[in-house]
Amino acid sequence: MKARLLVLLCALAATDADTICIGYHANNSTDTVDTVLEKNVTVTHSVNLLEDSHNGKLCRLKGIAPLQLRKCNIAGWILGNPECESLLSERSWSYIVETPNSENGTCYPGDFTNYEELREQLSSVSSFERFEIFPKESSWPKHNTTRGVTAACSHAGKSSFYRNLLWLTEKDGSYPNLNNSYVNKKGKEVLVLWGVHHPSNIKDQQTLYQKENAYVSVVSSNYNRRFTPEIAERPKVRGQAGRMNYYWTLLKPGDTIMFEANGNLIAPWYAFALSRGFGSGIITSNASMHECDTKCQTPQGAINSSLPFQNIHPVTIGECPKYVRSTKLRMVTGLRNIPSIQSRGLFGAIAGFIEGGWTGMIDGWYGYHHQNEQGSGYAADQKSTQNAINGITNKVNSVIEKMNTQFTAVGKEFNNLEKRMENLNKKVDDGFLDIWTYNAELLILLENERTLDFHDSNVKNLYEKVKSQLRNNAKEIGNGCFEFYHKCNNECMESVKNGTYDYPKYSEESKLNREKIDGVKLESMGVYQILAIYSTVASSLVLLVSLGAISFWMCSNGSLQCRICI
């Protein structure tokens, strides 16, 4: 018995088989991603898809400076408010910048009809030609073109008027009917502006236009309207009890616009031949202009990023990432990062992919660790690693390309009478934004789940590749490792790694070693059987003696009576 036990212990102590393990890369990365099933999964490599930083500056867009309206707004600029005179020389821009507190708009009080629509039209204009549509001196010879000034539009301490409009008044005590027209020969849309004056009393009406009842008629192929002045006393605004209403239209190439009036016309002086450009827009910002270039501008600052998403601002100009409400959009490209404890088991095997990754393998994602008489070491499987890198890179690029629809997103304008429409529009925009955010987050969650499963599958495939080569020349010992039944030097190990392992060459040696191990197992089984028999007999004897002693004690004190009946 002692001899058999000694054989078993010696066999176990002498075992020092060659081993090969399959595992994957690990590092000191702290990147975390989310998947459909898990939150904050630590991974070896990942890419960020969400831009959350800007430079806080206004920059040139693709080398072209923006039009800064400074203290003026769109109305003051396009009508020619005297306080906005410095803007008259501007001809082209990449985008238009208003400030939140711009104060110079319509200097003479009144309504600007369809002003929000005009802003929308101008948001797509990148340049224009400002030209005299009706020359001041020759177009209105029977009317006064110089006395139409007001303290409401003062400039340098003197009464003045809009630089793009003419306030026509009586001349030599007369205001004859006027009839003038313009044919658009510019080859592009022309923006034409005019106004109608509404005096506060009949006296002013007669003084300015020499008649109590007047009209203004404006006609083109797509515009036809007749205006009648509304004479009424009103609260003073900017010192004026009268009002001027402002109007505009876009004149198509070849179209004609005709003006007919017998009073109260604020006539066009300058008009604008518009050139539209992709990527232009209007933003409201307090940021200052700097010497910098960008492809994407927001009211908060410029974004220089190729990422598909941003959470900085929903209003953007240029080639910009899509705005989402997310705070994190990170796509995994590597593997789960679970560095294993580099402990050695009974046979000295390094823990494999079941327990964690290997920080010692730095030249690939998947690979091997071997140990034999010549030593031990890591080696990456370059083919499977490269195939995985190519596949994941293509996937990431595809996701970025599909989601990276860069565009301008400007805010919509509504007047005070369109509050319900504005609220509805905000709800619709919020709904679309929620959908975009949900789609982006769901896409990343799904792709992260697929990528991690893809890596797990690649490790398993590599394991099955080794297993199919070794067959019964080695045994699985767990942790992604195999223990050879034969000696496997470095050349042998290399053949396993590159798929050229010669199974027949080592099968005889493996068979003999396998039989020896099986014999030891059989001997040990005999030892275990003898021990089991002895243990059973001894336990039975102890039980019988115990029962006899208890019975004798109980009979002696009368607790148990024994009767034998014949």
UniProtKB/Swiss-Prot annotation:
SUPFAM superfamilies, per database record: Influenza hemagglutinin (stalk) (SSF58064), Viral protein domain (SSF49818)
Residues linked to a lipid group, S-palmitoyl cysteine type: 555, 562, 565
InterPro entries per the UniProt record, alphabetical: Capsid_hemagglutn, Hemagglutn_HA1_a/b_dom_sf, Hemagglutn_influenz_A, Hemagglutn_influenz_A/B
Major localisation: virion
Cytoplasmic face of the membrane: 551-566
Name of a matching Pfam family: Hemagglutinin
Any one biological process term the GO annotation gives: virion attachment to host cell
S-S pairs: 21-481, 59-292, 72-84, 107-153, 296-320, 488-492
Residues the record marks as carrying a glycan: 27-28, 40, 104, 144, 179, 286, 304, 498
UniProt entry keywords in alphabetical sequence: Clathrin- and caveolin-independent endocytosis of virus by host, Clathrin-mediated endocytosis of virus by host, Disulfide bond, Fusion of virus membrane with host endosomal membrane, Fusion of virus membrane with host membrane, Glycoprotein, Hemagglutinin, Host cell membrane, Host membrane, Host-virus interaction, Lipoprotein, Membrane, Palmitate, Signal, Transmembrane, Transmembrane helix, Viral attachment to host cell, Viral envelope protein, Viral penetration into host cytoplasm, Virion, Virus endocytosis by host, Virus entry into host cell
Record flagged with keyword Transport: no
Topological category with respect to the lipid bilayer: Single-pass type I membrane protein
MF terms (GO), sorted A to Z: host cell surface receptor binding
Cellular localisation: Virion membrane; Host apical cell membrane
Domain of life: Viruses
Leader sequence residues: 1-17
Modification after translation: Palmitoylated.
Sites annotated Cleavage: 344-345
Transmembrane feature ranges: 530-550
Family, per entry: Belongs to the influenza viruses hemagglutinin family.
Functional summary from the UniProt entry: Binds to sialic acid-containing receptors on the cell surface, bringing about the attachment of the virus particle to the cell. This attachment induces virion internalization either through clathrin-dependent endocytosis or through clathrin- and caveolin-independent pathway. Plays a major role in the determination of host range restriction and virulence. Class I viral fusion protein. Responsible for penetration of the virus into the cell cytoplasm by mediating the fusion of the membrane of the endocytosed virus particle with the endosomal membrane.
Assembly with partners or alone: Homotrimer of disulfide-linked HA1-HA2. Interacts with human CACNA1C.
Name the record gives this protein: Hemagglutinin
